A protein has these predicted regions:
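Charged, low-complexity surface segments at secondary-structure and domain boundaries
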Residues: 1-2, 46
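Intrinsic disorder/low-complexity segments, especially N-terminal tails and targeting/processing regions
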Residues: 7, 21-22, 26
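Bacterial N-terminal signal peptides
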Residues: 13-22
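A "functional boundary" signal
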Residues: 11-12, 25-279
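Bacterial N-terminal signal peptides that target proteins for export
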Residues: 3-13
Length: 279
């Protein structure tokens, strides 16, 4: 990525963080809010340090990749580690490294790796608005041939694609069609997930919220939050979703608190797929 694009992303990132900071500051009045706004302010000031930390990890992984034999499984694994670093940081780079892994798996006949990587790429592309590309990858996937452990990935990718399509289409007929497909794949997903899994709990929470039961959704979020370690992507996601539940409940103070916690985590981890900052 060129310097100007990176600078623009950093500017947008910091601008949105300041907006969140100001919103939280307006809601402040307790010592906990004061401490939180101070932490957010410090993180905004230090954002370039956090970016440098992530870039350092990526650089070290790329050095490992250079030393790997392209015919060896280690090449696939190092590519996968680089993809994970880019996933919530720079989407087009994440797509590139997943595509490299998909090509590698196809070239060397690693069918399990082909299927797993294809589904991961389909989900990522659907998240990035590359709907036709995601749909094509899913069309290339024969559900009947999938091992059972990949069925959740398949249904989750399909659910993601049709949820995104239903949200962005301007045609009411297509919206209803996509919503029906999203519901179908969500039902299928819930049937193959372990009830104790993080994705199962996330989907249950979303269902309760969509059904107009924010208190029940918040109870599920309590469980998720208890298991989410601070300063992790999971914590950023759970706190953001918690802020949305408090909004539904009309609790603006708690909404802003958890929105700020999510934004703070995003900044510290250099997560630029920052839903909390766009809210």
């Amino acid at each position: 990525m060129n310097f100007m694009v990176m600078e623009r992303r950093l500017f947008t990132f910091c601008f949105l963080a300041v907006v969140v900071w100001q919103s939280v500051a307006l809601a402040a009045g307790t010592s906990s809010f004061t401490a939180l706004t101070a932490s957010l302010d410090e993180a905004i000031e230090a954002h370039r340090h956090y970016v440098a930390v992530r870039e350092g990890r990526i650089a070290r992984l790329k050095c490992q990749l250079l030393d790997a034999d392209t015919a060896n499984l280690s090449f696939f694994r190092w590519n996968g580690e680089i993809y994970k670093e880019y996933k919530t940081y720079i989407c087009d780079s994440a797509i590139h490294y997943l595509r490299v892994n998909l090509d590698w798996a196809e070239r060397y006949g690693r069918q399990d790796a082909v299927l797993e990587t294809r589904l991961e790429l389909a989900h990522l592309m659907a998240s990035a608005g590359m709907y036709e590309e995601a749909a094509e990858l899913l069309r290339q996937t024969d559900k009947a041939s999938l091992p059972s452990h990949l069925l959740p990935d398949y249904y989750n990718a399909c659910h993601k694609l049709y949820t995104e399509l239903s949200f962005y289409t301007l045609d009411d007929s297509f919206k209803k069609h996509y919503q029906a497909l999203a519901t179908h794949y969500d039902d299928s997903l819930m049937q193959v997930l372990l009830p104790s899994s993080s994705l199962y709990l996330e989907r249950r929470e979303a269902r309760e919220a969509a059904a107009g039961h924010p208190d029940e959704a918040l109870s599920i979020n309590d469980t998720r939050l208890a298991h989410a370690k601070p300063n992790t992507p999971e914590y950023a996601l759970v706190t953001y979703q918690r802020s949305l539940l408090y909004r539904r409940l009309g609790n603006r103070e708690e909404e802003k608190r958890y929105l700020a916690l999510s934004a703070l985590t995003d900044i510290r981890l250099s997560i630029t797929d920052h839903a909390s900052l766009w809210n």
